[in-house]
Amino acid sequence: MPSVSAVIATTLSAHVHDVFGVMGNGNAYFLDALETTSTVFTPVRHEAAAVAAADAYFRACGRLAAATATYGAGFTNLITPLAEAVRARIPLVVIVGSAPESGMRDWDVDQTALASAVGAATITVDRMDAQGQTERAVALARSTRMPVVLAVPYDIGRASVADPDDAPTSWVADDAPTAPLDADEIAAAAAALAGAARPLILAGRGAWLAQAGEVLGELADCVGALTATSALGAGLFGDSPWNLGIAGGFGSHESAALMHEADVVLVVGARLNQFTMRFGSLLDPAATVIQIDTDPESRHPVTDLLLVGDAVDVGRALCDRLAEHRAITPWRATAGEVPHGLSSMVGEVAVLEDARLDPRNVFQRLDRALPLDRVVVQDGGHFIGWAPGYLRIPAPNRLIMVGTALQTIGLGFASGVGAAVAAPDSTIVLATGDGGGLMALSDLQSFIAATRRGVVIVVNDAGYGAEMHQYGSK
């Protein structure tokens, strides 16, 4: 009979093409077995980089990836990007060694409790049903859009699986029934949009994942709406002349002023966090806010009407209701040339009086110099707005911001690895800071090894800039 590790590797290879990780005592047999499959293993220097790379891979190409690490210290090293993936709703499978079935050793920790503390589920493999448990981990990650830890006890990794006659029936995922759209709510939303003088459609990453860009563009044309996106939805509306760019701190004052004028706002697949909402000042309090989301618990306090459903289905239903409504609102006619992103905040001088570079000027020049077929990977830090604000983003999966959900820094190089593997023919534009870059410098080598063509931009303010600005005046 095949070993537990061989069954896990073979089963996983049917669903996952790329695995990122660091080999250790707890996952060596799994990685050895993985070599016999079609799955490709990309090594990184730190366990945190393994999870961050798998996270960025999904964001860049939409396909499930896996990360792997050993038990104990290897597992504790990956907790921060695991927490990030949970909060950002990124599906991935993390295959880790764990304490043997015979009991905890001095160097073991309660990995299930640690994973649970950051919101990740753990499935522990046994000899009886290694295949079914691996299938379940993959299905759970996909259905919940969350990371799932698949733990392999140290003393069974090399052991043979149980005889198939003794194994339980393979686990099969139940397809969740799709609730029908509420016709009355669709009618109410359509009526509000039809009666709007200044309609705005604000879309996020959820709209991109649902592939709703086209139908939302049609809906915007139906009602004469301007459009905008969250940071993670940047590029959804392409080069539409009516797109205001990113809502929130990465947008211009002019575009924010136009968004504040909206009297009806349709929010699609965006969580409306405090940054998108400009800390409460983005929208007029009198505006009617309609929200589309698959999660009935996602309702934001400013939402007047929540439409629960797939963004494409709801968008199409609204388009059908508004098929005869083709009047262009005066708002579009008077909006003129819509400012995009931070482009109106031009850096007039390349080199300032203190001999330092103006980042506005630098990023504008980089935008002109770099190929448009790009994936922009943005590390966390005080400089976080320059690349999204000044570099053109072709589509939402071309801006990778691993770390924003948990407010981390130092995941840039690792995220670049995942983006490079997911989009090997594109130019990877990695923006990091001196603080975050030095924090994760070991995985610069991983990034170089994985990338065919790429540019690393280090925004160096000689310190942790966010803290200098936040506390320097206090």
Regions found by a protein language model. Name each.
Residues 22-24, 42-52, 67-73, 125-127, ...:
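Active-site nucleophile and cofactor-binding loops and adjacent substrate-binding regions
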Residues 3-8, 13-17, 22-35, 337-425:
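Active-site diphosphate/adenylate-binding microenvironment
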Residues 1-4, 151-152, 163-164, 168, ...:
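Phosphate/pyrophosphate-binding active-site segments
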Residues 39, 55-59, 71, 205-292, ...:
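Glycine-rich, anion-gripping cofactor-binding loops and their flanking helix/strand elements
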Residues 2-83, 87:
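N-terminal cofactor/phosphate-binding cores enriched in small/glycine residues
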Residues 14-18, 59-96, 116-168, 189-192, ...:
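Structural signature of the thiamine diphosphate
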Residues 95-134, 232-336, 462, 471:
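Glycine-rich, acidic loop regions that bind phosphate or pyrophosphate groups
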Residues 95, 103-104, 109, 299-300, ...:
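Thiamine diphosphate
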